[in-house]
A protein has these predicted regions:
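N-terminal lobe of the biotin/lipoate ligase/transferase fold
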Residues: 1-120, 276-282
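Long, positively charged amphipathic alpha-helical accessory segments at protein N-termini or as interdomain linkers
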Residues: 2-12, 97-126, 137-282
Length: 282
């Protein structure tokens, strides 16, 4: 290990620079072209600019560092240089606007599968999708997805799937250590970021276009199997709703059964797991 590597400044050419060759060897349509930069404000913003200037379906923007990366509801995405995967994929799907919100779950499945592969078969059940856009390992966030889109008439002109995966980091700020993790911290067996990237792109290529055309039906069983909130006591962070997660419907809505047996379909917002004591009381 070089002095630079010891300080987290991994050589770009030795790691992510292999990604185009791996993507090409797998014959993937997504990830080509792959635009790689050391630092950018936001890969989603880069992808939007590319979309407006005619970049093709599958074009992907990847950065070692983001200065203005964000998640849902404008949250800042913290990512030390060289530790993680930060990328955005341009998807020209031509689907109705109603098909866009569930795509964050489809992207979540692709990320989940790639993370589970990197951790090894023994950890497959530990990696789950948390509605609407997170991937967790043993209850801690390892990845997040931000899906954005633009309309052209009644159709979606393009979708941007922005993805951040904590891969190599072995330490986290104190305020995050209880709620976040990385593939490395969970004992990952394959820490090659280029391989993880290609695995995610392969999953997106397999599922996203079909989901945009036909809905969640083809992935619903897998989504149900890896649903982080199923059977768990949950509460909304921005409304009085509290109850038990009881699945995700074919429209991508979270189903929550309240104490009186009513099932509420949640289309937007954020839910968190309730503490065990609170769940027993409520």
């Amino acid at each position: 290990m070089t002095a630079a590597e010891e300080h987290g400044e991994r050589a770009f050419a030795a790691d992510l620079a292999r990604a185009p060759a791996i993507i090409a060897a797998r014959g993937l349509g997504l990830g080509a072209p792959l635009v790689v930069t050391e630092e950018t404000a936001s890969t989603n913003d880069d992808a939007k600019r590319g979309a407006r200037h005619g970049s093709p379906h599958g074009a992907t923007w990847l950065a070692e560092s983001q200065t203005a990366g964000r998640g849902r509801q404008g949250r800042v995405w913290i990512s030390p240089r060289g530790d993680n995967l930060l990328f955005s994929v341009l998807l020209r799907l031509g689907c109705p606007p109603a098909r866009v919100p569930p795509l964050s779950l489809v992207c979540g499945l692709a990320v989940r599968d790639a993370v589970a592969k990197a951790l090894g078969p023994a950890h497959d059940a530990d990696v789950v999708v948390k509605w609407p856009n997170d991937v967790l390992v043993r209850g801690k966030k390892v990845a997040g997805i931000l899906v954005e889109s633009a309309l052209s008439g009644a159709k979606v002109e393009y979708v941007i799937a922005g993805i951040g995966i904590n891969v190599l980091g072995r330490s986290l700020p104190d305020e995050l250590s209880a709620v976040a993790t990385s593939i490395a911290l969970e004992g990952g067996v394959d820490l090659d970021r280029a391989v993880v990237l290609a695995d995610v792109l392969a999953g997106l290529e397999r599922d996203v276009a079909l989901a945009a055309e036909r809905g969640l039906g083809l992935v619903h069983a897998r989504l149900s199997k890896h649903d982080a909130l199923a059977g768990r006591a949950v509460e909304s962070t921005d409304s009085p709703l509290r109850g038990t997660g009881c699945g995700i419907d074919l429209e991508g809505r979270l189903l929550v059964r309240t104490a009186d047996g009513t099932v509420t379909k949640v289309t937007a917002g954020e839910l968190r797991l309730r503490p065990v004591t609170a769940a027993r009381e409520g």
